Amino acid sequence: MDTKKEIKNNNFICQIINKDLNENKNLSFYTRFPPEPNGYLHIGHAKSICLNFELASLYKGRCNLRFDDTNPLKENIKYIESIKHDINWLGYKWHGNVRYASEYFLKLYQYAQELIKKGLAYVDHLTKEQIREYRGTLNTPGKNSPYRNRTIQENIELFEKMKKGDFSEGEACLRAKINMSSSSIIMRDPVLYRIIFIKHHQTQNKWCIYPMYDFAHCLSDSIEGITHSLCTLEFQDNKFLYNWILKNTSVKHYPKQYEFSRLNLEFSILSKRKIKILIDKNIIEGWDDPRIPTLSALRRKGYTPSSIKNFCQKIGVTKQNNLIEFSMLEHCIRKELNQTAIRTMAILDPIKIFLYNLDSNYKEEFIVPNHPNNPEMGTHKIIFTNTIYIDRSDFKEKYDKKYKRLKLGEKIRLRYSYIIHAEKIEKDEYGNISNIICYCDLNTLGRKPKDNKNPAVIHWISEKNTLSAEFKLYDQLFNIKNPEQQENFLLYINSKSLIKKFGFIEKKIGEEIQKKISNNNIEIFFQFERIGYFCIDFIDSKKNQLVFNRTVGLRDTWDSKKIKTKNITNN
């Protein structure tokens, strides 16, 4: 995948950048990825990360990592470390040191003082509820705060008192003085500073007043020399305030904001608030539960950095909000794993087969490829004995003409091995099949049977070549395509989003995995033949009990000839 070429050819933002660079030959492209450290990154953030870092590489520019840490109530060091890890995992490196908006708090405070001295900001004592009430609606203009027309000197003194901690939380705030009748609600005297008495993870207890995101963001962009500030469409109206603040302060550099559509993914919730509800109600295990699209969850499910970057490249960058097919994301990882995953056999729901014409000490070894189309990936040994396991779904007791696998009185070929014939069954006290008695035709290794009819092929594992394992079969968490739009999204939980199976993998393969787990070499991917692509669950696996997560099934349902997206209003 030539990501740079794809970006240059298909990205409307590139057209803007090309124009800017052509008009100003001395301009160097400079962008940033500015997450708030109040949660874990998800697939939507990956789109922004890929866009910013790939553009910086394409234009030989720079991309900063800046944490917009202006709300210590919701922020945590663990989110900072997780975000840095995710960006590195995707294969990107930010320019220079990690930056924090909190590094600029003194400078931001000085810019706020400038606005006060120009009569463009005032200290207000309305409560949060009163401010909301005074702001008006889309159809009705707002009304001025009774504190709006204080003198400049009074506002200077009050803002200094806010900084010193002389007011309690909610008792005072600093607001921009713009226009309470503006058609844009965001321009109706927005709050610029509020009081929060809590220890900040970077500045400790140095500050008790904190700038709002809209105030800190544009000024931080300016301080860092950002040329193109890229954000999603929900910040489109914020651009009015972004430009107003820059225009009315003494900044020396004027970045430009451009918006693109956010990533909306079928059957998924991206809202941090809603994901937390799912966790609190024990519907999912945590932020890395493979049923949600956080990057840590996708990593645990078996998605690779290249598959996620390929997905972001395929969906492109537009100004139209669309609902992206989940099958496109699956297509990207399936296509990669088809080339790279080791082939092996696993039995998820075992049923025993006894081959009565073979001795109990019968043993035969077969050398099988790790990948059918890539000899360089090597081979491994499997053994064949008189007792083997197949998957319960590969046998049917009652005759069914359409059923092409093993059934009583019929034959089947074992993968890489012989043809067997099912003659009778044994059941336990509950009526469940416990044993299938079969005849093994030893003249059929690599040969057709006497009737010249090749039967279907199923996978198997010798009883003497098994290692027990748990298999987690993940499906969509929701049973509707756009749960984000539902008022009560919890009504649409898929009760079968996780099914656990307990079975076997090939012993030698399992032992190799156990060695790698102890060495923390945990990115191990397999195609369990006829089942799907799986990875080792590096969180739940123990040395004596391996756990595998299904990454994706074998069948590709996405039409790769055209990118299918759906209007986000459709369910």
UniProtKB/Swiss-Prot annotation:
Residue window of motif 'HIGH' region: 35-45
Enzyme Commission number(s): 6.1.1.18
A Pfam family hit: tRNA-synt_1c_C
Residue ranges annotated as motif 'KMSKS' region: 269-273
Keyword terms, alphabetized: Aminoacyl-tRNA synthetase, ATP-binding, Cytoplasm, Ligase, Nucleotide-binding, Protein biosynthesis
An annotated GO cellular component: cytosol
Catalysis performed (reactions): tRNA(Gln) + L-glutamine + ATP = L-glutaminyl-tRNA(Gln) + AMP + diphosphate
InterPro entries: aa-tRNA-synth_I_CS (IPR001412), Gln-tRNA-synth (IPR004514), Gln/Glu-tRNA_Ligase (IPR050132), Gln_tRNA_ligase_bac (IPR022861), Glu/Gln-tRNA-synth (IPR000924), Glu/Gln-tRNA-synth_Ib_cat-dom (IPR020058), Glu/Gln-tRNA-synth_Ib_codon-bd (IPR020059), Glu_tRNA_lig_a-bdl (IPR020061)
Biological processes, Gene Ontology terms: glutaminyl-tRNA aminoacylation; glutamyl-tRNA aminoacylation
Binding-site positions, ATP: 36-38, 42-48, 232, 262-263, 270-272
Recorded superkingdom: Bacteria
Binding residue positions for L-glutamine: 68, 213
GO function term, MF aspect, one: ATP binding
Main location class: cytoplasm
Cell location: Cytoplasm
Quaternary structure (record): Monomer.
Family: Belongs to the class-I aminoacyl-tRNA synthetase family.
HAMAP family registered for this protein in UniProt: Gln_tRNA_synth
Protein name stated in the entry: Glutamine--tRNA ligase
Origin organism lineage: Bacteria, Pseudomonadati, Pseudomonadota, Gammaproteobacteria, Enterobacterales
